[in-house]
Structures are given as structure tokens and as C-alpha cells.
Amino acid sequence: RLLASPQYGERWGRHWLDVAGYADSEGYADADLEREWSYAYRDYVIRAFNNNMPYDQFVTEQLAGDELVNHPYENLSEEARRKLTATGFMRMAPDGTGSSGVDQMVARNEAIADSINVMTTSLIGLTVGCARCHNHRYDPISQEDYYRLRAILAPAMDWQAWRAPSQRQI
């Protein structure tokens, strides 16, 4: 009875949303701009829990859902929309690039670093932020490994072709 309840996904999905840093706003500046489409990611997580989605599929869709859908993104099936929505995971970190009065290059760099931090703490249980500047003192993460990981994400989080949060639907 409890597993069949729609509240099951809300209850247990909330734990994942906490780990993913889910927020309805950017969480960066005093203005704290609203993330207009963040609810879609929240609903994706709740549905995934209610539908008993396998964990490997859950993680794959969040990290690479856009790579699982063929271009162009027109006349999308419900499955394709789900996969694209799942990539909202990569945009849950604080992002100040839509705020006025901030250095955009610094804000973009911080948004990427925060996204890496969310991804690594939630999926591998390690903090890697220290490795931005030096080899991690306690975990086996070198500075070189950190920037290798960042290079993997570069196509999805291109700081030179950055879209402000208000220009995104994910």
C-alpha cells in the first residue's frame, strides 16, 4: 500500500533532491532569481521513484540524457522529454550568471565547479573541491584528475557559450 502511494516518490525523492542540491531559485545573489523550470526536474525525480526506475538508468539519464536523444529536439516523445528533463541534475548547483553586478567569468567558473561538487558528492561520495587548487589531502583525487573531470563536462558546460539561467529550459 505504501509503495503504491504517490507520496512514496515525494518522500524518498526528497532525499535525492537534497543530495542533488535542488532549489527553486539560483541561490547565488541577494536577488536569488527563480528557476522557472526547476519543478520539471523535481517531478522527474518523483516519477522515477514512483515508477521504480533502475538506479543505473536514473543516473545515466541525469548525466547524459541529452546524449540519449536524437537531434533535432523537435516533436519529442514523452521518453525523450523525460531524458532531457533529467539533465536538470547538472544545473541544480548555485548559478550566479543571471545576476547583475557579478563578474560573469568568475560566476561561470563557480557554477561549473559547484556542479562538479554536486555530481561527485552525490554519485561517488567524495568532495573534490580541494583539488581545484591542489591535490586532495585525504581522498585520492589529484588536481590533474579534477581538471580531467572538468574537461569531460566541458561540452555540456561551455563557459564561452554560456546561457544565463533565464535562457535555459533545463
Model-based region annotation:
Residues R1-I170:
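Short, structured secondary-structure elements
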